[in-house]
Amino acid sequence: MSRRGTAEKKTAKSDPIYRNRLVNMLVNRILKHGKKSLAYQIIYRAVKKIQQKTETNPLSVLRQAIRGVTPNITVKARRVGGSTHQVPIEIGSTQGKALAVRWLLAASRKRPGRDMAFKLSSELVDAAKGSGDAIRKKEETLRMAEANRAFAHFR
């Protein structure tokens, strides 16, 4: 048994303009080579583009997109008796949000075009509507978990 105490949960900080933790999560995940100011520029331009496209509150579109992509169950590879099984496990809201942000950014990067702000805004609007690559990824994960439900007792 470990003698160390359990680590305290760190709360995510909010971004300077919108005072929103989800925006800060996006900024920290989009970050490359330590260029945080560039990451902020990309996110803020994407938020402006969402405002222009939907003519609604862009933060509510962002929340709706992340809520739509967030999974509540995922699969984890588990080795049992020489064979590897995909075992479905339930995940918490924090881990689910982190996965959702990761999937949204991956789907945005895959989209055609040069401007990341445009690609991200398009993906967020699509995800809020219930379509797009990130939603497809969530559905695929849920299908995988449902198919491997028989291995749930390996948890």
UniProtKB/Swiss-Prot annotation:
> Which SUPFAM superfamilies does this entry report, sorted A to Z?
Ribosomal protein S7 (SSF47973)
Q: What is its main location?
A: plastid
Localization recorded for this chain is:
Plastid, Chloroplast
The record's section on InterPro entries has: Ribosomal_uS7, Ribosomal_uS7_bac/org-type, Ribosomal_uS7_CS, Ribosomal_uS7_dom, Ribosomal_uS7_dom_sf
**Family annotation (CDD domains):** uS7_Chloroplast
- A GO cellular-component term linked to this record: chloroplast
| Biological-process GO terms, alphabetical | translation
Write one Gene Ontology MF term.
rRNA binding
Keywords assigned by UniProt, alphabetized: Chloroplast, Plastid, Ribonucleoprotein, Ribosomal protein, RNA-binding, rRNA-binding
Does the record bear Repeat in its keywords? no
Biological role stated in the UniProt entry? One of the primary rRNA binding proteins, it binds directly to 16S rRNA where it nucleates assembly of the head domain of the 30S subunit.
Q: Which family does it belong to?
A: Belongs to the universal ribosomal protein uS7 family.
Q: How does it assemble?
A: Part of the 30S ribosomal subunit.
What protein name applies here?
Answer: Small ribosomal subunit protein uS7cz/uS7cy
Organism equals Ipomoea purpurea (Common morning glory)
Upper lineage is:
Eukaryota, Viridiplantae, Streptophyta, Embryophyta, Tracheophyta
